[in-house]
């Protein structure tokens, strides 16, 4: 416990809250280049092959980002736009790739929640 004299000299500091999306450096989204596109399996009760990409962001940090939706056209060297948002059953995946932006195509034949998956309105 500090003495009163130590408190007069230094004072107390507020703890700063840890940011969940540190690699974005305060931006809502960040551009990046895919360095590896692969599938991985989720945590215990679930079973699937989740599509994930390793992305080097313009901030210089390399992160794992989830590719949402059915089917994708991403490969190594694809330019992608990354947003925050974790995938609960994939440990270490704290970012998502935005569909329909830059090199990422939207999901084909998507009828509902189209704006989330970059799908155009069907005529």
From Swiss-Prot:
Function: With S4 and S5 plays an important role in translational accuracy. Interacts with and stabilizes bases of the 16S rRNA that are involved in tRNA selection in the A site and with the mRNA backbone. Located at the interface of the 30S and 50S subunits, it traverses the body of the 30S subunit contacting proteins on the other side and probably holding the rRNA structure together. The combined cluster of proteins S8, S12 and S17 appears to hold together the shoulder and platform of the 30S subunit.
Xref: PROSITE patterns: RIBOSOMAL_S12
InterPro entries membership: NA-bd_OB-fold (IPR012340), Ribosomal_uS12 (IPR006032), Ribosomal_uS12_bac (IPR005679)
Cystine pairings recorded for this chain: none
Swiss-Prot/TrEMBL GO biological process terms: translation
Protein's UniProt name: Small ribosomal subunit protein uS12
GO MF, one example: tRNA binding
Subunit structure as annotated in this protein's UniProt entry: Part of the 30S ribosomal subunit. Contacts proteins S8 and S17. May interact with IF1 in the 30S initiation complex.
Family, as annotated: Belongs to the universal ribosomal protein uS12 family.
One term under GO cellular component: small ribosomal subunit
Keywords in alphabetical order: Ribonucleoprotein, Ribosomal protein, RNA-binding, rRNA-binding, tRNA-binding
């Amino acid at each position: 416990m500090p003495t009163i004299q130590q408190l007069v000299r230094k004072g107390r500091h507020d703890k700063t809250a840890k940011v969940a999306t540190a690699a974005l450096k305060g931006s809502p989204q960040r551009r990046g280049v895919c360095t590896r596109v692969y599938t991985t399996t989720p945590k215990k009760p679930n079973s699937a092959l989740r599509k994930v990409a390793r992305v080097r962001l313009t901030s210089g940090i390399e992160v794992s980002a989830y590719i949402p939706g059915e089917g994708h056209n991403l490969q190594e060297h694809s330019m992608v736009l990354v947003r925050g948002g974790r995938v609960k059953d994939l440990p270490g995946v704290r970012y998502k790739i935005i569909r329909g932006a830059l090199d990422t195509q939207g999901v084909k034949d998507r009828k509902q929640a189209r704006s989330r998956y970059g799908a155009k309105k069907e005529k």
